[in-house]
Structure formats: structure tokens, C-alpha cells
């Protein structure tokens, strides 16, 4: 039996993992995705400005450090596992069950599932799956791959316009198609992309994808006007889909442990990350409490708070907070390496 099971491997879950390890707890970390990072993996190239003391840098760099930190105390990690139930068997005895039927036990549970399981909405076009490993994209991992390319973006929201704006600076051309008469993203961003000669095509959708000879890459796209039905075919090097996300948050509605909720979509926190069930804590975007702000920095704070509360639940005579890292014995040897690197 572990001390704590953390459900969700985004920034809050990862920091909870680190802080629980710092507090000498054994940790199990479960995530439904194949990689840790949560929603931060959706926008790896976006620049993050609002983490205190951290210079602005691409999200993927912050994510790399966050994962490294979250794994510092060697938690037991389970990826590609969807949690379907949380059961409180007794005080300091919880069962966490996965879709595959695995049952994990721990003395406390921290829920850090963000807005739930998030997956990009798929393009509803026949044969689309054959191109997903080549030049059809649902997430932009790197802008550099689009240098000097003809790029098509489907979608008219903020994410689509953000991608269009950034990619247009290095691509040969960028075309944005969307079903409505106007984009739904910020008006200021529309002006910016227009100034960069991004071609905006309202009331237009992707009708067909035309592959190359071996059907491994998209070579042409058939575009259709949604009102007239008129079509035309255009050559593109890459196609990006930005149609929003499918969200699944059935864990909280179906779990045996019925938690008090806020607006039916977030766990109600009582002053902090405490929930209505002793021994279960919630951190990050999934929890609502009076001091809540939806920032990565706040997710870190929530994670530490949840870990501290789990510690005192498991061990009532423990200190309410952990010892500051600058004077913590657990980092003594690691600090020597860091000091030598920076001072000598």
C-alpha cells in the first residue's frame, strides 16, 4: 500500500508528486495519457510568462523541468491507465480502480485530473487516420517543421489564429478555413494574422484529403463552401486541425466516493484543496476554492497544499508543512553538485 495515489500527471499532479516525496511519502502517479504533462502538451511552443521567478520560455521547456521534478523522488508511475472508481474502504485505506480492472491501494488520494481527459476533436473525413503520423496535425509540436511550407489550418478559434500567426512568420503560405462567416477568435488576433498575409476563408470546410501515390502523405485538399457546395482543390504541405477538444470527466460523476461539487464540473474545495471526504484531496484545474486562480503557478501551490494535507491525514502528528528546500537534508548531496556547477 502506498501513502498516496495521485490521479493525473499534469503540472499540479507532478508537483504534488514532488512535494509528497519531499515529505517522505511513497507515491503512485496514474495518468490516462501515454506521456506525463497534461494540458501543457497541447501548446508546447507557446511562451509561458506567468510563473513567478521563471523567465519567459516555451511551454515544452517548462514541462521538461516539471516532469523531471515530479519524478525526482521516484514515484511509481502508471501511464495509459484510466481511473474509473475511487473507494474509501476505511480511514487511511483507499482503493483506486482502473478501466483495465487493476486495483491500487493507498492511505490517501489526490485528484489532479485538470478539466478531465482532453483529446483534440478529430477531422471527420474518410481515411483521415492514415495521415496522422505524417503531415496531418492536431497539436503543433514545433513551428520549425513548417518553414517554407504551404500550410492549411482548419478552425477559427483562438488556438487556430495563434498557430496561424506564429507559423506565418516562417511558412511559405498559411490558409485558414472555418465554417462560420467570421472567426470566433479575438478580433485583435484576426487583424494580426491578416497583416501577415494569412488567407482567411470563411464558410469553408475540408471535404476530402487527397493522398500522394502511396497514400502516406496529404498532397492536396478539397475545400467546400458550406452554403453553395462549390469545391476547389489546393495543394498543401501540411494540414493542421483546430476544432476544439473532447472532454471526458466521468470519474467524478461515476465514482463510489461522491464528492461535493462546484457547478457540477469541479470538486468543491473547503478553503483549500480539502474535499468533502477526508483523505481525498483535489488540486489544479479540477478544484474550486475561494482563493482559486487558474494559473500553472497556482497549480503548483495546490499540489503542495494537497500533499501537506495528505501527510497530516496519514500521520496526524506530522508538521503541517514541509521543511523549506534550501535547508532540507534530502537535497544535501544534490546541492553540492549544483553549487560546484555554478560557483567553480
Curated annotation (Swiss-Prot):
The keyword Zinc-finger does not apply. InterPro entries: FAD/NAD-bd_sf (IPR036188), FAD/NAD-binding_dom (IPR023753), Fd--NADP_Rdtase_type_2 (IPR022890), Ferredoxin-NADP_redctase_2 (IPR050097). Binds 1 FAD per subunit. It holds the Pfam family Pyr_redox_2. One of its GO terms (molecular function) is ferredoxin-NADP+ reductase activity. Signal peptide: none annotated. Gene3D superfamilies: FAD/NAD(P)-binding domain. Its cofactor is FAD. Keywords: FAD, Flavoprotein, NADP, Oxidoreductase. It comes from the Bacteria. Its EC number is 1.18.1.2. It catalyses: 2 reduced [2Fe-2S]-[ferredoxin] + NADP(+) + H(+) = 2 oxidized [2Fe-2S]-[ferredoxin] + NADPH. FAD binds at residues 12, 31, 39, 43, 83, 118, 285, 326. Belongs to the ferredoxin--NADP reductase type 2 family. Homodimer. PANTHER family: THIOREDOXIN REDUCTASE 1-RELATED-RELATED. This is Ferredoxin--NADP reductase. It comes from Staphylococcus aureus (strain bovine RF122 / ET3-1). The lineage of its organism: Bacteria, Bacillati, Bacillota, Bacilli, Bacillales.
